């Protein structure tokens, strides 16, 4: 049995250690929003009121950390792929009008989801501490050498990724009411493939901080509501673009986000969990994204059925399209022709998918009594959109993932 466990640990470690490659975002806008954590991944990311895995509590509503007893450690992650296709009638070319259709060659990448929670009740504190590491944002595409040479996409290769480390705590103030707070230290890597007149200089990185504040309340034994607020996470990438012979910084911020959630456990003797989340993302006040996105609503529903040691999960989400169809002629203050801004939207930031379907399965007592295994898969239905009158983009996104969770002390099962 110990050999089998060692093999599983090695495989997961190798999986998470794979070098990430540029791909496409799978959450809302450029944010992942818990859609690729071990249990919530099978429930369309639903986790605001009653999360079913450790990373979802750490990177979601920090007040829900108080629901986790004992010591729990999750090692997990997922693989996501999306290949945007851009079509243009040739008007974006500088010397000819040859129409083109090109699909990004960027490969998929790994999104880690790891976390540990430690119950503080043995110290006389009625709460739980959490620490985690996860991919929180990302997108990218690559078209070099595949479109007419007179088109700026012929030199375009873009990538943007944010890896976040979270530390937070949730405390039970009464039997029904809990509060929590978390701090995210994010490190971001940016090379968005901007071409003329502000040309991307190279891959650069920066760090940023984000605060997260949450509340959770049990209406009764079967119904729970939760809410949280995330501050903006600001990055300033040094010398990221070149205009002539001068280099300039580029500002990019992940938006303020408000999340609301509801969970019900009154059906099938408490074995059926039904939950729903609502998010509002404020792209219009986030540098760079404010030039190409509009504020966005997202709605997600998820279910989990427990049968003995098995858990079966389903989820669906819908979000409004964040694409701004009335863009101007600048990006983060740098001058760009409106047609080039629209081409940038289509080629590098076409987060246009609105419908998501997910499924997952969990096994308690996998290999050993205190180890749980969770698997999930999901996809965003193929979507297309027009960017101005000359450019169209389409993309479908798929992802799979898993997680192993070790539980010790006063926690024989994940919270439901």
Walk through the language-model features, giving the residues of each.
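Short, solvent-exposed beta-strand-terminating loops
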Residues: 75-88, 188, 234, 321-327
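N-terminal secretory signal peptides that target proteins for export/translocation
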Residues: 1-3
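N-terminal, post-signal peptide beta-strand-biased segments of exported outer-membrane/organellar beta-barrel
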Residues: 22-129, 133, 340, 347-352
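Solvent-exposed, glycine/polar-rich loop segments of beta-barrel outer-membrane systems
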Residues: 90-100, 149-152, 194-202, 239-249, ...
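C-terminal segment of classical bacterial N-terminal signal peptides
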Residues: 14-23
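Transmembrane beta-barrel wall of Gram-negative outer-membrane proteins
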Residues: 101-230
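Outer membrane beta-barrel transmembrane domains
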Residues: 29, 96, 205, 209-416
């Amino acid at each position: 049995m110990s050999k089998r466990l060692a093999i599983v640990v090695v495989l997961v470690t190798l999986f998470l250690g794979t070098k990430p490659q540029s791909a496409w975002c799978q959450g809302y806008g450029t944010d992942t929003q818990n859609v690729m954590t071990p249990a919530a991944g099978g429930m369309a990311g639903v986790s605001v009121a009653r999360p079913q895995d450790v990373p979802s509590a750490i990177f979601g509503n920090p007040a829900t950390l108080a629901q986790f007893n004992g010591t729990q450690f999750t090692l997990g992650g997922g693989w996501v792929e999306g290949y945007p296709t851009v079509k243009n009638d040739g008007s974006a070319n500088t010397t000819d009008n040859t129409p083109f259709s090109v699909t990004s060659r960027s490969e998929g990448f790994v999104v880690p989801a790891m976390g540990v929670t430690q119950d503080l009740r043995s110290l006389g504190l009625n709460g739980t501490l959490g620490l985690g590491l996860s991919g929180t944002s990302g997108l990218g595409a690559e078209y070099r050498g595949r479109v007419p040479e007179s088109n700026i996409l012929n030199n375009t290769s873009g990538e943007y990724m944010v890896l976040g480390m979270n530390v937070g705590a949730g405390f039970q103030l009464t039997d029904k009411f809990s509060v929590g707070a978390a701090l995210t230290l994010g490190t971001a890597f940016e090379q968005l493939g901007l071409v003329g007149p502000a040309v991307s200089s190279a891959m650069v990185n920066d760090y940023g901080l984000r605060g997260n504040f949450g509340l959770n309340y049990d209406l009764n034994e079967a119904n729970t509501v939760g809410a949280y607020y995330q501050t903006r996470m600001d990055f300033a990438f040094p010398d990221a673009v070149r205009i002539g012979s001068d280099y300039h910084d580029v500002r990019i911020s992940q938006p303020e986000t408000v999340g609301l959630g509801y969970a019900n456990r009154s059906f099938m003797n408490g074995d059926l969990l039904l939950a729903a989340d609502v998010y509002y993302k404020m792209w219009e006040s986030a540098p760079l994204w404010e030039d190409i996105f509009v504020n966005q609503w997202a709605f997600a529903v998820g279910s989990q059925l427990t049968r003995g040691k098995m858990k079966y999960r389903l989820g669906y989400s819908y979000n409004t399209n964040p694409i701004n169809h009335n863009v101007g002629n600048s990006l983060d203050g740098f001058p760009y022709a409106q047609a080039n801004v629209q081409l940038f939207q289509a080629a590098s930031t076409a987060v246009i998918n609105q419908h998501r379907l997910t499924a997952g399965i969990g096994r308690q007592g996998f290999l050993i009594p205190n180890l749980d295994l969770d698997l999930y898969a999901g996809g965003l239905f193929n979507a297309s959109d027009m960017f101005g009158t000359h450019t169209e983009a389409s993309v479908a996104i798929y992802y799979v993932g898993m997680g192993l969770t070790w539980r010790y002390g006063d926690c024989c099962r994940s919270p439901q």
